[in-house]
Amino acid sequence: MSSKQNNVLVTGANGYLASWIVKKLLIEGHTVHATVRDKHNKEKINHLLEYEKKYKGNIKFFSADLLKKNSFDEAMRNCSIIFHTASPFKLEIKDPVRELINPALEGTKNVFTSANKIDSVKKIVLTSSVAAMYTDASECKNLINNEITELTWNKTASINYQPYSYSKTLAEKEAWSLYKKQSKWELVVINPSLVLGPFPNATQTTSESINLLKQIGDGTFKIGVPKMPIGVVDVRDVADAHYEAAFNKKASGRYITSAYNTSFLEISKLLLSLIHISE
């Protein structure tokens, strides 16, 4: 699927990862239908408008709500590819069902249900997570070679234990279930590890990944950072992976997207070296 004549839809287009996907699409000359909560909130979309001025593609904004049925119908019309990135990533929550599970699960249902109604849709690229594959290192003990692969599913997360991982697992399983019930569009899923890297909009840093870096720098972890290995990947590489998933005809199934393993301590040391503050 290499034609750039048809439109593409990006849900949650002003988000951390989604903004990089939109930028890539505009550079390549696509027309992007971008859904956001409020298309009239210029502060949230100004960086995307600046991309449109710089690159050869075009962008059209639509207001949409993950929890409202038919909310994506208008934005999806005449689109051949859907990038469904919109889903909450929060670690500090009070109500996991309302804040995480409902938006992730119902949002997936609503976007995919709209896709079933729109004849132009040929492929959906879903942003999932390695969190849909495992909760923590304890799960690896029961895996062959202690290895997580694209065949691995999270079996331990719940509403009360790692609800974010639970929300990603439920949403992705629902996506595959809906995919198997139809034959008009293909599904490719990207499962990144911890996504880090520059934020495309310097004035709007509302991302859990950015919050983590802030906490490392603002003294939140001054007593000590968690001794925990973690896989990380550059946000720009994840955006490129989404693009390849959409336009590479051989792309199918799930793709773990992770660059290397590190730790919070190593990330802290790297940040320290970049800002030139002595230890």
Can you name each region flagged by the protein language model?
Residues H84, P88, I93-Y164, V188:
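Conserved Rossmann-fold NAD(P)-dependent oxidoreductase catalytic core, especially the SDR/UDP-sugar
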Residues N160-P163, G197-T206, F221-R236:
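Glycine-rich "substrate-gating" loop/helix at the edge of Rossmann-like oxidoreductase active sites
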Residues K181-W185, G197-L212, A245-Y255:
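Glycine/proline-rich active-site loop of Rossmann-fold NAD(P)-dependent oxidoreductases
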Residues K39-E106:
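NAD(P)H-binding glycine-rich loop region in Rossmannoid oxidoreductase-like domains
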Residues L213-I223, M228-Y255:
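Alpha-helical substrate-binding/gating segment
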Residues A239-S278:
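Mid/C-terminal beta-alpha module of Rossmann-like enzyme folds, strongest
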Residues K4-H30:
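N-terminal Rossmann NAD(P)H-binding glycine-rich loop of SDR-like oxidoreductase domains
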Residues S158-L187:
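Active-site Tyr-X1-5-Lys
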